[in-house]
UniProtKB/Swiss-Prot annotation:
Domain of life, source organism: Eukaryota
SMART domains: H3
Protein name as it appears in the record: Histone H3-like centromeric protein CSE4
Subcellular locations according to the entry: Nucleus; Chromosome, Centromere
SUPFAM superfamilies: Histone-fold
Main location (coarse class): nucleus
Record region (Disordered): 1-50
Length: 150
């Protein structure tokens, strides 16, 4: 059985469009001209970041800022709950000054930041970039009973 090859001027298959169909090479639609309406069926894709770029951007943002990262109301609820459990029900109607709660939150966040710095150093010492539970345990064990305070 012999095969017959038909040579034609178009190299595409009949019925299938050639090319990108009017799309930008990166998958974006072309810009609309003034007075021209955009076709709502075509989707404009956002530019994709390389893996790890968004994480690095987030790290830089948090290192630059000084704002509190834990929400204030949930933190205040936890503080009140711990105080109630520690002191007992006879002190059930304790009132807290907002500055006292703010000072506790500042101290708690500073403690956590310092702890995670130590945990990161433990992970780097183990030739890893990912922190693990064993890094947290080692950092807390090295810090001692008071967690590096005092």
């Amino acid at each position: 059985m012999a095969r017959i090859s038909l040579a034609s001027s178009s190299a595409g298959v009949a019925g299938k469009p050639r090319g990108g169909g009017g799309l930008h090479p990166l998958g974006q639609t072309r810009k609309t001209l003034p007075g021209e309406r955009r076709d709502t069926t075509q989707k404009i894709t956002k530019p994709r970041y390389k893996p790890g770029q968004k994480a690095l951007k987030e790290i830089r943002r948090y290192q630059r800022g000084t704002e509190l990262l834990i929400a204030k109301l949930p933190f205040a609820r936890v503080v009140r709950e711990v105080a109630l459990n520690y002191l007992g029900s006879e002190y059930g109607n304790l009132q807290w000054q907002s500055m006292a709660l703010l000072a506790l939150q500042e101290a708690a966040e500073a403690f956590l930041v310092h702890l995670f710095e130590d945990v990161n150093l433990c992970a780097i010492h183990a030739k890893r970039v990912t922190i693990m539970q064993k890094d947290m345990q080692l950092a807390r064990r090295i810090r001692g009973a008071w967690g590096g305070a005092g």
